[in-house]
Swiss-Prot record:
Transmembrane segments: none annotated. It is found in: Secreted; Secreted, Cell wall. Its main location: secreted. It comes from Agaricus bisporus (White button mushroom). One of its GO terms (molecular function) is structural constituent of cell wall. Disulfide bonds join C36-C93, C43-C87, C44-C74, C94-C108. Coiled coil: none annotated. This is Class I hydrophobin C. The keyword Disulfide bond applies. Keywords: Cell wall, Disulfide bond, Secreted, Signal. Belongs to the fungal hydrophobin family.
Length: 115
């Protein structure tokens, strides 16, 4: 009788182990990726479209792409939420960092960060 229980347990054990979930795979929908495809991640207190800032951009010698944002008073963010680099304003990905007067970052795109 004991040998039948032992054999049944030995046969069932590999089946149970093979059906166990393993770590890794695809991230769930709540995973936040704080990575820019192009450029660097910044926290900008103000963003303006170039049509609102053409006069200021021309005076400061800053060339901006049409449709992109200009970032004002920006600070770099290494990883959101780590090391005290939290962004109370709008996090943006910027292609160029040119410190020409008031404009800190050029060609910025806002990113959505749901924490």
């Amino acid at each position: 009788m004991f040998s039948r229980v032992l054999v049944a347990a030995l046969v069932a054990l590999p089946v149970l182990v093979s059906a166990s979930p393993t770590p890794g795979g695809y991230p769930d929908s709540t995973t936040v990726v704080s990575q820019c495809n192009v450029g660097e991640l910044h926290c900008c207190n103000t963003q303006q479209t170039p049509d609102h800032t053409n006069a200021a951009g021309g005076l400061l010698g800053a060339a901006a792409n049409v449709g992109a944002l200009l970032g004002f008073d920006c600070t770099p963010i290494s990883v959101i939420g780590i090391g005290g680099n939290n962004c109370a304003a709008q996090p943006v990905c910027c292609e160029a960092n040119e410190f020409t007067g008031l404009i800190n970052a050029l060609s910025c795109s806002p990113i959505n960060v749901n924490l």
